[in-house]
């Protein structure tokens, strides 16, 4: 059994889920009502809320069946716009794309929390850092938990009923303490979190690997898909 998550920003990632199953136990596919060896496809768009154009493209993709799932960047300027769309088009499979970075040179954002409460997450201009490495260097885990919680609560306040948590640029993987917070809040809010096994997990530091290894199901891989990728570059997993 394989579950394939195909995602785009619109461009994004492909993830494979193939958890091992003990004899006599149902596979994940069977628990979802499918045959044990079924291949299931979820098409997922992240970075919703980052720009009006992304919101429009994502809405059209939801309506046409081009995507079946997505995740929103709550701190970004165009999040309220998508939240309004979401409220008028429920139910949609939309998660929270936990955001701790602002990677563009001339288009920036900060946190949902007051700046004075999360100083370790912000640069000298009051914006999130551009890179995951900077998050790992500067971020105070207490402030990270405060900000992630604020993003979840902000989404709930605007009517989003999230189906999962994932992470912009993988920023919650910057150091083990942040991974633990990510998993903790997923359990607290009863939301599945995006976690990856395969070669990524094997190459991760021991403490990060140990924190993630207990989560189920794990994704076997994460692959970017961009709009200009030629069709011939894709093959069945």
Feature-to-residue mapping (PLM):
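N-terminal pre-catalytic segment of deacetylase/amide-hydrolase enzymes
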Residues: 3-6, 18-42
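Acidic (Asp/Glu)-rich catalytic clusters
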Residues: 31-33, 58-64, 80-93, 110-123, ...
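Structural preference for beta-strand elements that scaffold enzyme active sites
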Residues: 40-42, 67-71, 91-97, 162-166, ...
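A cross-domain feature marking catalytic cores of carbohydrate-active enzymes
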Residues: 45, 71-74, 96-102, 167-169, ...
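A short alpha/beta connector and helix-capping loop motif
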Residues: 53-76
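Active-site gating/metal-coordination segments in enzymes
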Residues: 98-162
């Amino acid at each position: 059994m394989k579950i394939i998550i195909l995602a785009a920003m619109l461009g994004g990632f492909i993830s494979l889920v193939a958890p091992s199953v003990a004899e006599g136990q149902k596979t994940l596919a069977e628990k979802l009502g499918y045959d044990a060896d079924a291949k299931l496809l979820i098409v997922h768009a992240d970075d919703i809320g980052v720009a009006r154009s992304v919101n429009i493209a994502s809405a059209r993709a939801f309506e046409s069946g081009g995507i079946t799932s997505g995740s929103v960047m709550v701190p970004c300027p165009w999040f309220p716009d998508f939240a309004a769309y979401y409220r008028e088009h429920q139910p949609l499979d939309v998660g929270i794309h936990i955001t701790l970075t602002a990677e563009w040179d001339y288009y920036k954002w900060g946190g949902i929390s007051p700046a004075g409460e999360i100083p370790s997450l912000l640069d000298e201009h009051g914006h999130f850092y551009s890179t995951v490495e900077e998050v790992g260097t500067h971020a105070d885990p207490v402030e990270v938990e405060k900000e992630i919680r604020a993003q979840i609560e902000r989404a709930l306040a605007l009517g989003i009923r999230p189906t999962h948590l994932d992470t912009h640029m993988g920023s919650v993987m910057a150091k083990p303490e942040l991974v633990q917070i990510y998993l903790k809040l997923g359990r607290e809010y009863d939301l599945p979190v995006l976690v990856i096994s395969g070669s990524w997990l094997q190459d991760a530091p021991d403490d990060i690997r140990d924190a993630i290894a207990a989560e189920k199901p794990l994704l076997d891989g994460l692959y970017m898909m961009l709009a200009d990728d030629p069709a011939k570059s894709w093959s069945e997993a």
